[in-house]
């Protein structure tokens, strides 16, 4: 019961900061950037604590059957990259000059007063951990026990994509299709393997190098 309450508190805090404050009220400026970064770090740490059993299980699964988990890790990476290439090609065909609002906001963030190390920790490490906790461990892991995975996984992927969008326009939607496919691949992988560290590791690996390169280019 206590763990269920903690998960609900984590979800509520995530919704308040990243949906209501950022998407609905649309608070802007460096104040909200600091809020987002601190929320990612603090809620990411809280997510590690709340889902510590799931993370420990993932680590144990690597010890029990390392070859199986390596194959799933590689397969998940290849599937994610392949679907991302296809969806990016669709954007290239339909909107070749469009740059998503999220890409612009990330580049602007590294020109703000927020230190690069804070941005990298928030967006490259704790942000991915928090998002995996919400969309995979909480939604897919919990809801698929009561609702069909064929419903839960696509819905979770759709929500994951929607939370990264900054406008309800077709170009913005098309530019974020890779997020939907990533959510599908990560959701299926977690549901089948029960290993949370695969999607967490890939999510961090997907974000961290890009952020470091942006920080270097802006410096």
Regions found by a protein language model. Give the residues of each.
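Membrane interface segments of multi-pass transport proteins and intramembrane proteases
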Residues: 27-30, 95-99, 143-151
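Juxtamembrane helix-loop-helix connectors linking adjacent transmembrane helices
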Residues: 57-127
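Alpha-helical transmembrane spans of integral membrane proteins, capturing the lipid-embedded, hydrophobic core
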Residues: 11-19, 37-41, 45, 69, ...
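Structural signal for membrane-spanning alpha-helices in multi-pass inner-membrane proteins
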Residues: 18-22, 44-51, 80, 84, ...
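Cytoplasmic juxtamembrane interface segments
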Residues: 47-67, 139, 197-198
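Alpha-helical transmembrane segments in multi-pass membrane proteins
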Residues: 5-56, 103-104
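Transmembrane helix-loop-helix hairpins at the membrane interface
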Residues: 116-219
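Membrane-helix interfacial "entry" motifs
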Residues: 3, 28-32, 61-65, 69, ...
């Amino acid at each position: 019961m206590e763990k269920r309450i903690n998960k609900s508190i984590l979800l509520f805090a995530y919704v308040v900061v990243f949906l209501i404050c950022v998407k609905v009220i649309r608070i802007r400026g460096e104040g909200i950037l600091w809020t987002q970064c601190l929320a990612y770090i603090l809620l990411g740490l809280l997510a590690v604590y709340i889902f510590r059993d799931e993370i420990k299980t993932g680590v144990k699964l690597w010890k029990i059957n390392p070859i199986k988990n390596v194959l799933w890790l590689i397969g998940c990476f290849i599937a994610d990259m392949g679907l991302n290439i296809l969806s990016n090609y669709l954007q290239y065909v339909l909107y070749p000059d469009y740059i998503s609002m999220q890409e612009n906001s990330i580049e602007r963030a590294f020109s703000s007063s927020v230190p690069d190390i804070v941005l990298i920790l928030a967006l490259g490490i704790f942000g991915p951990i928090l998002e995996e906790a919400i969309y995979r461990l909480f939604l897919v892991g919990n809801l698929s026990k009561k609702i069909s995975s064929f419903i839960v996984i696509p819905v979770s992927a759709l929500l994951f994509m929607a939370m990264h969008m900054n406008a309800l326009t077709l170009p913005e939607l098309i530019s974020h299709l890779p997020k939907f496919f990533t959510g599908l691949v990560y959701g299926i992988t977690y549901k089948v393997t029960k290993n949370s560290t695969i999607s967490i590791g890939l999510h961090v690996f997907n974000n961290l190098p890009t952020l470091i390169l942006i920080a270097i280019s802006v410096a």
